Amino acid sequence: LALRAPGLGEVRVQALASGVSRGTESLVFLGRVPASQREAMRCPFQDGEFPGPVKYGYASVGRVLDGPAELAGRRVFCLHPHQDRYVVPASAVVPVPASVPDARAVLAANLETAINGLWDAAPRVGDRIAAVGAGVVGALLGALAARIPGTRVEFVDPDPRREALARRLGCRWAPPERAHGDADLVVHASGHP
């Protein structure tokens, strides 16, 4: 399909990588977005309506092909659905530092979710924090929480492969049946009720 040229204040982006959310996008793909959540789950630049067909996604890293001189040729992150090229307002893209590989840059949307989760949970210095689920969002949340002085962060996840990740991030790991029951704060990030 032909893609229109960018107008004033817009950029044309060639996608390099796109992240797929196992939880959210599984609901979208299967047409199971609850009617009560459809407006909240709309993503920027979404095309179509729930339950579908719908063009969805919100984790694109690409290179600016055309646009303002300060962005031309730069790698950028955009909350855009999965497609190989797109035109968006220049204000919708964020430059990606050269030191950040594409595979990490696509996690920016997940990192935003983890940060918002911590803001809402309001952990305090010295809190014992349990992150239920050590997938992408849970791991990012745990990594951030572990930087708060005096905290003890424990990933509660049935997958024993998460133990090595927990250690690398300065956290503990336990399967549900061995989790500490003394948490001051519990954040559910498993994607499963």
Residue ranges and their predicted role:
Residues Y56, V88, V106-A109:
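Conserved SAM-binding loop and adjacent beta-strand
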Residues R4-V20, V28-H80:
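Glycine-rich beta-strand-centered segment in the early N-terminal region that forms part
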Residues S190-G191:
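Short glycine-/small-residue-rich Rossmann-like dinucleotide-binding loops
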Residues F77-A90:
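A structural motif shared across PLP-dependent enzymes of the aminotransferase-like
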Residues P101-P176:
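Mid-domain Rossmann-like dinucleotide-binding core that forms the NAD(H)/NADP(H) cofactor-binding site
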Residues R178-V186:
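A short acidic, Gly/Pro-enriched loop at the edge of an enzyme's catalytic core
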Residues S91-D102:
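Glycine/charged-rich beta-loop-alpha catalytic/anionic-binding loops adjacent to active sites
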